[in-house]
Every structure is written in C-alpha cells, then in structure tokens.
Amino acid sequence: MAHPLEGIIREAYAAFGRGDVDGYLKVCTPNFVFNVPGRSAISATYHGKEGVYALAGKAMEITAGTFHEDVEDVLANNRHAVVLARHSFTRDGLAKDYRTAHVYAIQDGRLAECWEQPQDPAVFEDAWGPGL
C-alpha cells in the first residue's frame, strides 16, 4: 500500500509542472531548503518560498520556458521521500535530458529539505551550463 505522502507529492509536482509554484509549496515547510549540487548555472542552496521561486525562474530563463519534468516514481514514508524524475529541455538550441532523484527530509508530514541527486553529474552540469 502506498504511503499517503506519495499522492500528495505527485500532486505537488503536477502543480509545479503547470507553473503553479504555490501548489508545490503548499506541501513544504515555511523554511524549506532545496539543494542543487555542483557548479552549474542553477547550483545553489535555495531557502524558503523566495528560494523556490528563484530556482524556478532561473530554470525557465535558462531553458527559455522549455523545462519539462516527468515524475517516474515516488517513494515515501514518515521520514523521507524520493522522487525519481526525468528532466528535459532545450538550452541554447540543444536538446538536454537527464535523470535525477530528489531526496526529501519529511517534517510533520511536509517536505522540509530536498537534495537533488543527478544520476550522472557530468550530464547534469552539461545540461544546465556553467555557473557564473
């Protein structure tokens, strides 16, 4: 039987995919943190609502609005959740595609912190381009 958070997280990702960042944030704690590894153009630690909006804005700017996320699976329990996803977009006229895992810490039934874990860090870095 699926954990109730699995459906809630799927709905949050669907909201994000529609451009409804607040719909995603509804399942996050107020002090939510999203960690993006590496040295790419989006690599940083993003804090709170403003941080998530900054990350989404950066992703849309770099991809000229072509960013697309397919959720392949969601696993969850009362302490952790993992979203397996495939990201695809166009950057500078080139198609980019990679798989990643979003590993979440759960606090009081809400997403408290996320660590992006690309399947292949080199492909991830190439997809997003160099940071400044």
At which residue positions do the language-model features occur?
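Short, low-complexity N-terminal intrinsically disordered segments enriched in polar/charged residues
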Residues: 1-30, 130-132
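Short solvent-exposed loop/turn micro-motifs enriched in small/polar/acidic residues
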Residues: 6, 65-67, 95-98
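Hydrophobic pocket/interface hotspot
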Residues: 9-12, 24, 28, 32, ...
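A solvent-exposed, acidic/Ser-Thr-rich amphipathic alpha-helical stretch
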Residues: 22-25, 29-79
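A short, polar/proline- and glycine-enriched secondary-structure boundary/capping micro-motif
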Residues: 45, 93-96, 122-128
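Short beta-strand segments that buttress and anchor functional surface loops
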Residues: 58, 83-91
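Hydrophobic/aromatic beta-strand elements that line small-molecule binding cavities or substrate pockets
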Residues: 69-74, 86-88, 99-105, 115
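Low-complexity, intrinsically disordered terminal/linker segments enriched in charged
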Residues: 113-132
